């Protein structure tokens, strides 16, 4: 479609082009253009840099238009599918929606873990580049890097107050970082014989648990840095350790296709969960708020009455997500939909939904009550490796092999 400019607009555009040619040293072109466009040799100051300003404005507007179009497509889809629209959704129904609010770059290798700070508006990313980076998730600003590991940082975890950060690495060490003032490493613990793949604080904050490729889980005293307990039982690499909020039990998952739930105060395995057909990559404890949705979903499959829990979700290389009642060692439901390994899980604080990250490059939102995938976000250019859901603010973060960390707003 031909755009029609008024005489004045045409003259101003010609002046701006002449200014651009002159200021960038295109003398011959400028002379020819002045003759053909009848532009005076005395360029006014107001035309200085005007063409560049207009060009950058167009690019900014184009980006805004694309974002609005994505949101409009999203809204139209919801109307067609009959999902509650934004005005009708309560905060308990808010889920991550495209496009991402921020795409954060700075790491020089794959992202291995992303987590929110429990109190401040900060998030932390760990990477195979051996660094940990701190970001402000509300502004998308980079804050600082924590350096000290000499190999891939595999996992990070905060204590309940967010005063200490624990990290573990393929360099066989676990480090504790002061997250209040100095942001320096205050302790380094050694004891594992192979890659340390996961780390978690117990709720009281006085102990840290670590899981390793050496097939063991170790408990470390924060005050002294000493290993006080070693749990054995897995037959292969222990991928992840996660502590239940009450602090009396914790769960681990492994390349041996099993999940084990352990008693914190002894070295005993309370229950072994078997049903996955491949390596179990990730686990997540369900909040109390999820109990009713899980029970309702399980009701169709299990005619055994009300399940007490606690409930645990697991994601595997067999592409499935399973929800377990660990008190009886029973798999209550299986969620199918991912086309590749499931690498990360996080429950919605309201308990209705579970979000998952996968090597199929997507984030999926699962409606637990109806046992279905209600939204798929094509999140990254490469495998999605980690995901976290903020407990108080409407944000989800994801990390990927594409070296980016993305912040998703929930609405």
UniProtKB/Swiss-Prot annotation:
Belongs to the WD repeat LIS1/nudF family. GO terms for biological process: border follicle cell migration; centrosome localization; centrosome separation; chorion-containing eggshell pattern formation; clathrin-dependent endocytosis involved in vitellogenesis; dendrite morphogenesis; establishment of mitotic spindle orientation; germarium-derived cystoblast division. The keyword Transmembrane helix does not apply. It holds the Pfam family LisH_PAC1. This is Lissencephaly-1 homolog. Residues 56-83 form a coiled coil. GO terms for cellular component: axon cytoplasm; cell cortex; dendrite; dynactin complex; dynein complex; growth cone; kinetochore; kinetochore microtubule. Positively regulates the activity of the minus-end directed microtubule motor protein dynein. May enhance dynein-mediated microtubule sliding by targeting dynein to the microtubule plus end. Required for several dynein- and microtubule-dependent processes. Its main location: cytoplasm.
């Amino acid at each position: 479609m031909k755009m029609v400019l008024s005489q004045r607009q045409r003259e101003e555009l010609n002046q701006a082009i002449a200014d651009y040619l002159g200021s960038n040293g295109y003398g011959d072109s400028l002379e020819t253009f002045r003759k053909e466009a009848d532009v005076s040799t005395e360029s006014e100051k107001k035309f200085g840099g005007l063409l560049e300003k207009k060009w950058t404005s167009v690019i900014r507007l184009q980006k805004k238009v694309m974002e609005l179009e994505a949101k409009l497509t999203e809204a139209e889809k919801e109307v067609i599918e009959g999902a509650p629209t934004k005005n009708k959704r309560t905060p308990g129904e808010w889920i991550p929606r495209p496009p991402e609010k921020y795409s954060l770059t700075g790491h020089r290798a794959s992202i291995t873990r992303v987590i929110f700070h429990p109190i401040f508006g900060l998030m932390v990313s760990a990477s195979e580049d051996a660094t940990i980076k701190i970001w402000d998730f509300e502004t998308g600003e980079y804050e600082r890097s924590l350096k000290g590991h000499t190999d891939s940082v595999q996992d990070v975890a905060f204590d309940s107050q967010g005063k200490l950060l624990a990290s573990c690495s393929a360099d066989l060490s676990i480090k504790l970082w002061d997250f209040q003032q100095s942001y320096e490493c205050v302790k380094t613990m050694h004891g594992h014989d192979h890659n340390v793949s996961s780390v978690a604080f117990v709720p009281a904050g006085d102990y840290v648990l670590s899981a390793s490729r050496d097939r063991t889980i170790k408990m470390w005293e924060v005050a002294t840095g000493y290993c006080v307990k070693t749990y054995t039982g897995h037959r292969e690499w222990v991928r992840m350790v996660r502590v239940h909020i009450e602090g009396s039990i914790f769960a681990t998952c492994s390349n041996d296709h099993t999940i084990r739930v352990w008693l914190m105060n002894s070295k005993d395995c309370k229950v072994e969960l078997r049903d996955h057909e491949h390596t179990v990559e990730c686990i997540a404890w369900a909040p109390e708020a999820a109990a009713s949705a899980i029970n309702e979903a399980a009701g169709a499959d299990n005619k055994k009455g009300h399940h007490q829990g606690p409930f645990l979700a697991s994601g595997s290389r067999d592409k499935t997500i399973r929800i377990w009642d660990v008190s009886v060692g029973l798999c209550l439901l299986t969620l199918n939909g991912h086309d590749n390994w499931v690498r990360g899980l996080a429950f919605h604080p309201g308990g209705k939904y579970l979000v998952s990250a996968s090597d199929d490059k997507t984030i999926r939102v699962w409606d637990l009550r109806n046992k279905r995938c209600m939204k798929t976000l094509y999140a990254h250019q490469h495998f999605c490796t980690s995901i976290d859901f903020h407990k108080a603010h409407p944000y989800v973060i994801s990390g990927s092999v594409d070296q980016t960390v993305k912040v998703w707003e929930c609405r």
